[in-house]
Amino acid sequence: MDLENKVKKMGLGHEQGFGAPCLKCKEKCEGFELHFWRKICRNCKCGQEEHDVLLSNEEDRKVGKLFEDTKYTTLIAKLKSDGIPMYKRNVMILTNPVAAKKNVSINTVTYEWAPPVHNQALARQYMQMLPKEKQPVAGSEGAQYRKKQLAKQLPAHDQDPSKCHELSPREVKEMEQFVKKYKSEALGVGDVKLPCEMDAQGPKQIYIPGGDRSTPPAVGAMEDKSAEHKSTQYSCYCCKLSMKEGDPAIYAERAGYDKLWHPACFVCSICHELLVDMIYFWKNEKLYCGRHYCDSEKPRCAGCDELIFSNEYTQAENQNWHLKHFCCFDCDSILAGEIYVMVSDKPVCKPCYVKNHAVVCQGCHNAIDPEVQRVTYNNFSWHASTECFLCSCCSKCLIGQKFMPVEGMVFCSVECKKMMS
């Protein structure tokens, strides 16, 4: 498919998840409605990952596309209908007999993802070493956490030009080259094994806490096979604490088999969240999730959340923006050359600020213009003028004077306060 056709195919999938309730805003949100170019809901401004959107197939397609043309093709399967690669997510179902008064019932636990290992006991042990609130048990808080991290750590618009907004043919080509490069140089999937199993597979080096990587003992040298020794000769690359050989460890091939991590320590070095499904990016001796690896390589637009492949973009408030996306967060009007106010790290034009965000003066009960001086005490504000910041009893101007605040009112003296009580 040529670049022109790829550009024409682009769209953000506005029908996807339409009307889904927001898990954060509850009834305050009318239901999910994707903004035209921002990756947020038009109604409540929360991201799609905050809404109860059924995305299992879409997420499997996204991860499948990520693994396409990599060494991890064993983790994907192409649908016969359209040839789209689908992620072969490993689902683990555990059955535990539960004793009852008359008979034995079966308690079934389904993990929406589990490490693809042949030894189910090892996978089970891996899960038990994760914080309970992050174990992806179907219908649990952990499953919701995994879903949210899939959206956050591996945004589709970081790998698929068709998920981006109005890229030029040149930008499409540059993005495809960028994706090809990180697939060949940084992308990896963690491998769960017992540390002792790697002796024959990886380099004969181990990480010693407080020391250098050691070389194997000479032929004929005596080795201490005691359990105490084996519990201290391996240490986690992240927390530096020793590991027991009987506990599962995660290896990252791109990092080298002399490094290993506790399951709960296999996290992004920037956001410190568990690397979802053990998908990692390796750079400068550090683990990254997909999002933060891309952030280390390319500027990201604070408006649309996409990587910037254009030669021209703007920087404002310590953030990067496509020229066309430096807009008011409320009304989408272009802010270049206009007065704006930052509200929760989002730029808002002056009219929208006055209408939606400005504090109200306790004196005149009008919104306070962002360019006008004001007096603030606790959660109350006044215009810093002789007409507004007055004693609530005698109307004496209190600018530069001592005052007594009482539930939104201010007094110049105890006498005035008593008269109003």
Curated annotation (Swiss-Prot):
GO terms for biological process: negative regulation of cell population proliferation. It comes from the Eukaryota. Its main location: cytoplasm. The keyword Repeat applies. PROSITE patterns: LIM_DOMAIN_1, LIM_DOMAIN_2, PET. GO terms for molecular function: zinc ion binding. Residues 133-164 are annotated as: Disordered. InterPro entries: LIM1_Testin, LIM2_Testin, LIM3_Testin, PET_domain, PET_testin, Pk/Esn/Tes, Znf_LIM. It is found in: Cytoplasm; Cell junction, Focal adhesion. Scaffold protein that may play a role in cell adhesion, cell spreading and in the reorganization of the actin cytoskeleton. Plays a role in the regulation of cell proliferation. May act as a tumor suppressor. The N-terminal and the C-terminal halves of the protein can associate with each other, thereby hindering interactions with ZYX. PANTHER family: LIM DOMAIN-CONTAINING PROTEIN, TESTIN. This is Testin. It comes from Ateles geoffroyi (Black-handed spider monkey).
